[in-house]
Curated annotation (Swiss-Prot):
SUPFAM superfamilies: L28p-like (SSF143800). One of its GO terms (biological process) is translation. It comes from Nostoc sp. (strain PCC 7120 / SAG 25.82 / UTEX 2576). Belongs to the bacterial ribosomal protein bL31 family. Type A subfamily. Binds the 23S rRNA. This is Large ribosomal subunit protein bL31. Part of the 50S ribosomal subunit. It comes from the Bacteria. The gene is rpmE. One of its GO terms (molecular function) is structural constituent of ribosome. Keywords: Ribonucleoprotein, Ribosomal protein, RNA-binding, rRNA-binding. One of its GO terms (cellular component) is ribosome.
C-alpha cells in the first residue's frame, strides 16, 4: 500500500520575485521564490549582451600551439 502524506504541499500560484517585484507565477513546492536574474533582466534575452573578445579565441589557439593562421583548411585535409 502507498504511504500517505509523503508528498510536499503544492502551490499552483507560487510568486517569483526579482528585486522585490513579482515577475511571474509558477507552480512550486514553495509559496514564494526569490531570484536574482530572470529572462526579463538577463542581458542575453534583453539584447544588451556585449561580446568581449579582446584577443580572438582562434588566434590565441593558433599562437599557443604554434600553428600558422595562413594555412587553409583545404591544405590540412590533403594529408
Amino acid at each position: 500500500m502507498a504511504k500517505s502524506d509523503i508528498h510536499p504541499k503544492w502551490y499552483p500560484e507560487a510568486k517569483v520575485y526579482c528585486n522585490g517585484q513579482v515577475v511571474m507565477t509558477v507552480g512550486s513546492t514553495k509559496p514564494e521564490l526569490h531570484v536574482d536574474v530572470w529572462s526579463g533582466n538577463h542581458p542575453f534575452y534583453t539584447g544588451t549582451q556585449k561580446i568581449i573578445d579582446t584577443e580572438g579565441r582562434v588566434e590565441r589557439f593558433l599562437r599557443k600551439y604554434g600553428m600558422s593562421s595562413t594555412q587553409t583548411s583545404g591544405e590540412q585535409t590533403k594529408k
